[in-house]
Design a protein with these regions (language model features):
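Secretory/organelle targeting and membrane-embedding segments
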Residues: 1-196
């Protein structure tokens, strides 16, 4: 219901949305408790059997960063970090912030590589997938008239303005540890500068 409501004002084909929503399943469990992973493992197995799905699973950790070590550890303890078939695979996606310092990032990286192969680990920042960032790439590289001129010889300066209509909302705990400067400037805005 929440997904459908959030897409209410978007241009979404109802047939495609219904087809997608039939494949969305929700399972609430305490990710700090190993028993929850048994429930998740059983649910995945059940869905794979019922819908004849391949043994290809992505774990997307859209969680507070403090959980980035515990969740993969629990997945491993429950045998969920390795595929159960020859043609299967497992992937884990971790959103930034990837540690709070070089040392903590290296520690987290070492921990993840102990549980998953490097090729199975994806470290991402959702910001580059946003429409504005994608439009910069399209505007620059898809327009043959601009691409050869888009360099220091023809551009005096680049100004990037970050305007958000969201407040802290429920992200207070995140900003207490990560900080708005680290989240917005050091990550998102520097990424936009790199695109230009």
């Amino acid at each position: 219901v929440h997904i459908r409501e959030s897409l209410k004002n978007k241009e979404v084909d109802d047939v495609e949305l219904d087809s997608f929503l039939r494949r969305v399943f929700y399972l609430a469990f305490d990710s700090t408790n190993s028993a929850g992973y048994h429930k998740l493992k059983d649910r995945i197995h059940q869905l794979r059997q019922e819908q004849q799905l391949p043994d290809k699973i992505i774990y997307y950790l859209a969680t507070p960063p403090v959980m980035y070590e515990l969740i993969p550890t629990c997945l491993k303890e429950n045998g969920m970090n390795v595929a159960g078939s020859e043609d299967g695979w497992r992937r884990v996606i971790v959103e930034k912030p990837f540690g709070t310092s070089l040392e903590s990032a290296e520690r987290l990286n070492k921990h993840l590589i102990h549980i998953f192969d490097e090729k199975e680990i994806y470290r991402i920042d959702h910001f580059l997938g946003k429409e504005t960032a994608q439009n910069v790439l399209a505007f620059r590289f898809a327009n043959g008239i601009f691409e050869p001129l888009w360099n220091r010889n023809y551009i005096d300066y680049v100004e990037i303005t970050a305007v958000e209509n969201l407040g802290i909302e429920q992200r207070g705990g995140f900003y207490e540890t990560a900080g708005a400067l680290r989240d917005m400037v050091q990550n998102h805005l520097i990424q936009l500068v790199a695109l230009t």
